[in-house]
Amino acid sequence: MLRATAPCWFPPGYPEAKKVAEEAALEASRHLGGEQSQAGAPEGSKMLRATAPCWFRPGYPEAKKVAKEAAPEASRHLGAEQSPAGAPEGSKMLRATAPCWFPPGYPEAKKVAEEAALEAPEFPLPSHQPAQSFGLWVPQMHKQASAFVDIQAEPQNRGPAVPPAWPKMVTESCYFPAQRGSACRLPAAPRLTERPSGVRISAPRKRKTIAHSSSPCLVTGYTDAKRTRVASSSQRSRGSKVGRQPGKTRNRSGMACKTTATTSSKRIVRRASLPSLSLKKPIILRSSGCQVPTVLRRGYLQLFTEECLKFCASKQEAEEKALNEEKVAYDCSPNKNRYLNVVLNTLKRLKGLTPSSMPGLSRAALYSRLQEFLLTQDQLKENGYPFPHPERPGGAVLFTGQGKGPGDSSCRVCCRCGTEYLVSSSGRCVRDQLCYYHWGRVRSSQVAGGRVSQYTCCAAAPGSVGCQVAKQHVRDGRKESLDGFVETFKKELSRDAYPGIYALDCEMCYTTHGLELTRVTVVDADMRVVYDTFVKPDNEIVDYNTRFSGVTEADVAKTSITLPQVQAILLSFFSAQTILIGHSLESDLLALKLIHSTVVDTAVLFPHYLGFPYKRSLRNLAADYLAQIIQDSQDGHNSSEDASACLQLVMWKVRQRAQIQPRHRSASPAALACP
């Protein structure tokens, strides 16, 4: 038997294999002849020769020859037992395994396979194919398809290869049943809508990664259970004995999973914070081409609103006043620096206001107190206030020396440099001449050895060449054009009403016919701007006078309001009994072409120490009496700022006269007027 299997000991095609097989066949024939051969045939030889094709490697020429010789013997041997119809079953079986004799793709294999397919039995028979293992040729059993080959792709393995039967470890039998039992008692976890992350937050600004487990449901459920039990135990008792702690998650090696335990115990629960109860900020929309940042405007608007809430009756009123104050500051500020200067002064003013509904506050009482500060008829005439013309309707008359030019009507005198120049009938300069002038005033100061006079703009001596240059000469012209004036009239008032108290300020520019109105602002006794608008002059503008007026070409270009429209609006506000407050108010009334005699002039109320005709500037008065700095921008004056400063100066005078000190630091000018 051992020698019969000798062909398997040699590699395919080895010459010694055939010799050993033949010798083994004779011995096998003698040994098996008497027991298994009923017909007396050498059964051992037949069986060995029938398997001869397996002795050779696929495609070896001798294999086919031996197979053909073995086929008739196998047919005779198996015909009587397995083939009732007498078919050569041995030949069929051998030829059915013929494709295994040749290497894959060998041309002869396909032909033999097609012939064998017709004679192959219905049940699959084992076939043999050589396989190389450790240098020996070992036959390997497999099943051969009859006509088609099915190809199945192996599943993609994303992890290390795991044997189909993982050996059960001792730790699994110890810890896994307990985990499965606790997991079965836990409630089902909510289904996540997003892919769960492998990162847990253990402490602020620290992250720890949890290792992936083969049973994520068990690990997740157990971790959540531990989280719940720890929280409940900490809330039940504080300072009591520590009870039984839940077991930590174990891994396959039997060690506790420190990452999971640490993460669950130090996990920080995020909670939604409640919105703070703060004041809702008023909205300021962004505007294109704005030099003042919107964020800066919103910040100061919030500050204005907070201050207005202290003295306004309602939140809506406070927001409206804050929006109005911020809008006025923004409209009169062409750049950021000017805006900051204006809003800071406005904020100071708002901090000094108190509610207008305070006990003892009466506008009628304030009106009666201001009666003693009104200008008399002589003061009005002396300071150049206009009076109605006795003969010409719409005309005005001045009782001071009116500006008289040279004898020639086409000759004018420049109000800035004092040079005479010629003009045409339209008021334009006949010749283009540059104007050199000093925009500052002449001031005398005490120095060592005496007093020295110099200009405030450049510190130059009087009579020196001007430090500024203009394209052409200009003139005032207000005292020469005294037509188109309107006069305030008396109005019937109710018993509880009073005529009103307003502060007024105007800005002007130079035209071909002199100074004309370009902006007017009216402020009431509560420091509220009730009217503020730009005005389009009637004649051509030659110099916008931006250094003092703060009005630019863009401001005038976007307005269509004319002087007659402004006069109509002011007549609806004012009456003959209304008190108007201003600094050198005669210049404003001349620009408005308005005749009004109930006025309080701060230039007269706070006289210059040298007496008339000298007058103190509004800037110096505000600095001395109000501790405020105004008109400190190179972009020009602010009419609302000047009007408010005049009103505060008058209230300061009322308080001083009544010798009443304010009870609170944040007292309004109107409240300070009452005892």
UniProtKB/Swiss-Prot annotation:
MF terms (GO), sorted A to Z: exonuclease activity; nucleic acid binding
One Gene Ontology term, aspect cellular component: cytoplasm
Entry's EC annotation: 3.1.-.-
Keyword set includes Cytoplasm: yes
SUPFAM superfamilies: Ribonuclease H-like
One GO term of the biological process aspect: rRNA 3'-end processing
Region (GOR1-125 epitope): 358-483
UniProt entry keywords in alphabetical sequence: Cytoplasm, Exonuclease, Hydrolase, Nuclease, Nucleus
Record's subcellular location: Cytoplasm; Nucleus
Main location: cytoplasm
Superkingdom per UniProt: Eukaryota
Pfam families: EloA-BP1 (PF15870)
Keyword Nucleus (UniProt): yes
SMART domains per UniProt: EXOIII
UniProt cross-references to PANTHER family, sorted A to Z: EXONUCLEASE GOR-RELATED, RNA EXONUCLEASE REXO1 / RECO3 FAMILY MEMBER-RELATED
Family classification: Belongs to the REXO1/REXO3 family.
Name of protein: Putative exonuclease GOR
Organism: Homo sapiens (Human)
Gene (name only): REXO1L1P
